[in-house]
């Protein structure tokens, strides 16, 4: 008789894990749809590239480790890693970037530690940060939302730009990034940070086309609301708990409000922080990763609050416009310490 030796954790429930990952993938549909609507078909192409890359990379490592490829890939975690990375990068980023980031996330940030359940850092955010540090220009080249864009690439144009850098008519990223004011557009957070450093007043900045939205940046507010809708559905399905999203958003809103009240000429208003960038994606889909987040209820509140504080600090005073990825990874580092001091007292034992 042959016995198969499996690595810990031995209580791992494959069916339950697969179901939760599938629920998260389904909950991402509103956010993906919003990004497709406002930023074009490039998002879908990036998702397909990332998904295939994640599956192939994990299959290769599992084969080398002589583990069951089919059984492991059925947990859907590889697909989720690819999806989270794909929706975090600009929709028309070169194809090799999403492949590189996804392969790094799947192999180095996940399988190198032993696979799902043993990685200390969120794999998708590791891949994102590697790309952001290595290729900052490409990683910050977001298209303007279609409502303020001059050139809206179709499906074929998106594929051509991703794989060749040019559309069929010879257009490139510089022409595609032009807004209705004839100026290359950036995200609301990037525009605010750059303009403040250039000495522009907040009143002037709020007149830019990118801030033509009702609540925050054009397009971005609806993208964030779509991710919020998906996150609320996850809460309703009990696929995630409320502690991390709530503490993250409350802390971010509180810090942003206090900062804005004390320095309204240099710091962004709270609605811009809450409805721009990757705020809602981070709150409900990234920080709630059960493997890399805190495991106690008090710990989850602390973990979410820490991430919210870090996001505000990085956005307001750091060198990057959106600090969600860095905040997630920095918060991941503190998880063992948080869990140690927030673990429930064993019955019959004194505190201390």
Curated annotation (Swiss-Prot):
Localization per record: Cell inner membrane
Cofactor requirements of the protein: FMN
E.C. designation(s): 7.-.-.-
Membrane-traversing stretches: 20-40, 42-62, 89-109, 123-143, 214-234, 242-262, 267-287, 301-321, 322-342
Record-linked Pfam families: NQR2_RnfD_RnfE
Signal peptide as annotated in the record: none
Any one GO CC term of the record: plasma membrane
Keywords assigned by UniProt, alphabetized: Cell inner membrane, Cell membrane, Electron transport, Flavoprotein, FMN, Membrane, Phosphoprotein, Translocase, Transmembrane, Transmembrane helix, Transport
Mode of membrane association: Multi-pass membrane protein
Main location group: membrane
InterPro entries per UniProt: NqrB/RnfD, RnfD_bac
Keyword rRNA-binding among UniProt keywords: no
Modified residues (FMN phosphoryl threonine): 187
Gene Ontology BP annotations: electron transport chain; transmembrane transport
Record's function text: Part of a membrane-bound complex that couples electron transfer with translocation of ions across the membrane. Required to maintain the reduced state of SoxR.
Family under the similarity heading: Belongs to the NqrB/RnfD family.
HAMAP family: RsxD_RnfD (MF_00462)
Complexes and interactors: The complex is composed of six subunits: RsxA, RsxB, RsxC, RsxD, RsxE and RsxG.
PANTHER family per the UniProt record, alphabetical: ELECTRON TRANSPORT COMPLEX PROTEIN RNFD, ION-TRANSLOCATING OXIDOREDUCTASE COMPLEX SUBUNIT D
Protein name listed in UniProt: Ion-translocating oxidoreductase complex subunit D
Species per Swiss-Prot/TrEMBL record: Escherichia coli (strain ATCC 8739 / DSM 1576 / NBRC 3972 / NCIMB 8545 / WDCM 00012 / Crooks)
Gene: rsxD
